[in-house]
Regions:
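Long insertion/accessory domains within large nucleic-acid-processing enzymes
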Residues: 1-326
């Protein structure tokens, strides 16, 4: 709703990284402390902030290697080879998870056929979005498979406004438990008021009430800096003309009890961005998995299917909680 000249020049509206949302700045349920955000579950179900995440897998073949379906006697256990075509490559538009083979590859070593087939990353899933391959004598033979994953926002995903007010999702609650106005307007997300004064992000508040006027008038607004002198007075007059409080404050009611809140709550329309920091890519844990040859200890690193090391201080925390076995 609120643009700048630079955002128009770089065609930001044609491929935005977020959506316009109704925000409320309030302390609610205690789950939006420390910059965390409370999300409206029904807004997520309607598709807000849904995104597509692409991951590409590429594999080359060298001497004595080929793309093919491995013999049943040499296959890796616990994996599904049924989605491969005769050339050893998965079918396009197939749904895959971390047990499906996407590229069948065999290698001949000392007269033995070794299975070197490729799966997608652990806990990943999605649809095969594109397949690119080269199989000629003039270049390296390769196969590239692109997987498209639908990412729905969940707890611990990160979001931010265009003014540096960033935070992770702390709680997702149904719409009927969210605060609401007398007109039935329910915010899409609730941010904490304690993150505003010390950061002095005045533009964050100005964009919210400007977006509110834009939604009432059905238009957009040029919010370029160092322009529109005294425009704040015009914005407040528009809000008053439409029977809203001039500074964007509204009377809200508790979604759990229906009681009116004792204080007014700031509400407005604002553009929020979904950031690339998603919990699906960062969460790390293991139950069973590979061990190192030398120490017989769990492997190190998320890529290897390893766990997090329990150091001295972590051990002390477990003992303080009364853990006798681990």
């Amino acid at each position: 709703l609120v643009n700048t000249k630079i955002s128009n020049n770089i065609k930001f509206n044609e491929m935005p990284g977020g959506a316009n949302v109704v925000i409320a700045i309030a302390s609610y349920t205690g789950y939006n402390q420390e910059d965390s955000i409370i999300f409206n579950k029904n807004s997520l179900q309607r598709g807000i902030f849904n995104s597509a995440y692409y991951r590409t897998y590429i594999e080359y073949i060298e001497n004595d290697e080929s793309f093919s379906i491995p013999d049943i006697n040499t296959r890796k256990s616990g994996h599904n080879y049924n989605k491969l075509e005769t050339n050893g490559i998965i079918q396009n538009n197939s749904y895959v998870n971390d047990t499906d083979i996407i590229i069948g590859k065999t290698s001949k070593i000392d007269g033995k056929i070794i299975d070197k087939s490729i799966t997608i990353h652990h806990h990943d899933f999605g649809v095969v979005d594109g397949i690119f391959s080269s199989n000629n004598d003039t270049s390296n033979n390769f196969c590239k498979v692109r997987i498209r994953m639908e990412r729905i926002p969940t707890v611990a995903d990160k979001f931010a406004s265009r003014h540096g007010i960033k935070g992770v999702v702390g709680l997702i609650i149904p719409q009927e438990d969210m605060p609401f106005t007398s007109d039935g307007i329910v915010p899409d997300l609730i941010i904490n008021p304690h993150g505003i004064p010390s950061r002095m992000s005045t533009g964050h508040l100005l964009e919210a009430i400007t977006g509110k006027t834009c939604s009432l008038l059905g238009t957009t607004y040029d919010g370029s800096p160092y322009e529109n002198y005294n425009e704040f007075d015009n914005i407040t007059k528009i809000l008053q003309y439409h029977d809203f409080e001039m500074y964007g404050n509204e009377t809200l009611y508790n979604g759990f009890t229906g009681d009116q809140f004792s204080s007014s709550i700031f509400m407005g329309c604002q553009f929020y961005q979904r950031l690339k920091h998603m919990v699906h890519d960062k969460i790390q844990s293991r139950d069973v998995g590979p061990k190192t040859l030398l120490e017989r200890q769990p492997a190190k690193g998320k890529v290897r299917g390893g766990g997090l090391r329990i150091g001295e201080m972590e051990r002390d925390s477990l003992i303080s909680h009364g853990v006798s076995k681990f």
